[in-house]
Amino acid sequence: MTVELPSTQRALVFDTWNGPLEVRQVPVPSPADDEILVKIEYSGICHSDLHVWLGDLKDMSVCPLVGGHEGAGSVVQIGKNVTGWQLGDKAGVKLMNFNCLNCEFCKKGHEPLCHHIQNYGFDRSGTFQEYLTIRGVDAAKINKDTNLAAAAPILCAGVTVYKALKESNVAPGQIIVLTGAGGGLGSLAIQYACAMGMRVVAMDHGSKEAHCKGLGAEWFVDAFETPDIVSHITKLTEGGPHGVINFAVARKPMEQAVEYVRKRGTVVFVGLPKDSKVTFDTTPFIFNAITIKGSIVGSRLDVDEAMEFVTRGIVKVPLELVKLEDVPAVYQRMLDGKINSRAVVDFSL
């Protein structure tokens, strides 16, 4: 089986941070001996793509750049040293790749912490293009029965929330608060949390209450209209939730979480406020034996586990399919807080 390939492809490129986003023709790459070439059929649009383009993550990214890091498609070429892949297989291109597989972090399953990591859509051109090479050992295998459009966001958003839920150490039957619950990450987190047996308190703007409860949240807290968030959640959960995951990109909910989480509870930070700084009183942190930790995407195994929920239909990805040319408009809606679903580029449009 051979696949005839074009010499050029469409890609969404920016030359300077916060500069024009332009669809251009760029060369189709050839895979190295240890790589496969994936025809990208769908690419999720992540908030971090927006922040890279805006220049908020200059220390981690380069220009010019093709953004994107949630790509799903089909294998169309295979390097001579690659094993385990066949032409036509469904493959995923996730954010963090090129880890060494030999350091202490890789050996313990903490692959995203490897010092050799390279990030698609950050320091390597990413999935907002029709063809992309990736090492065979890095590409995620996607079940042939999995909806590829739904699979794309799982490669970053899905595994991010799934791993954060695992990091929260909240057990089945216990309560977890999800801030920013009505957004793209939160919408997935509600479903994963419910599937894992957790009881969910969703926190976001009041306009997103029906959306969050429709996904399985047991309670909803209006983050903008509730007079005293800390006392309200403490009372609602009879002593505080066992865990909190902060998806909101603001300082206040991060600081409040330390005050209302249950004794010996865990607060997980995922959302990045613009200035990346928070301030909180160390007294409750110490005297209540609270654990505060960060969480960033997940390992190969985490990706496989997160994808299985989607393949089995347990987690449903709220999708909005858009054209490649629509990415700038999606970024603006993200800035305006008007995204309830996962926007995904459909390259057939």
UniProtKB/Swiss-Prot annotation:
Gene3D superfamilies: Medium-chain alcohol dehydrogenases, catalytic domain, NAD(P)-binding Rossmann-like Domain. InterPro entries: ADH-like_C (IPR013149), ADH-like_N (IPR013154), ADH_Zn_CS (IPR002328), GroES-like_sf (IPR011032), NAD(P)-bd_dom_sf (IPR036291), PKS_ER (IPR020843). Its EC number is 1.1.1.1. Zn(2+) 2 binds at C100, C103, C106, C114. Keywords: Metal-binding, NAD, Oxidoreductase, Zinc. CDD domains: CAD3. It catalyses: a primary alcohol + NAD(+) = an aldehyde + NADH + H(+); a secondary alcohol + NAD(+) = a ketone + NADH + H(+). Zn(2+) 1 binds at C46, H69, C156. It is an enzyme of class 1 (oxidoreductase). SUPFAM superfamilies: GroES-like (SSF50129), NAD(P)-binding Rossmann-fold domains (SSF51735). GO terms for cellular component: cytoplasm. PROSITE patterns: ADH_ZINC. Its cofactor is Zn(2+). GO terms for molecular function: alcohol dehydrogenase (NAD+) activity; zinc ion binding. It holds the Pfam family ADH_N. NAD(+) binds at G180, A181, G182, G183, G184, L185, G186, D204, K208, V270, G271, L272, R342. It comes from the Eukaryota. The keyword NAD applies. Belongs to the zinc-containing alcohol dehydrogenase family. PANTHER family: ALCOHOL DEHYDROGENASE 1-RELATED (PTHR42940:SF3). Homotetramer. This is Alcohol dehydrogenase 1. The lineage of its organism: Eukaryota, Metazoa, Ecdysozoa, Nematoda, Chromadorea.
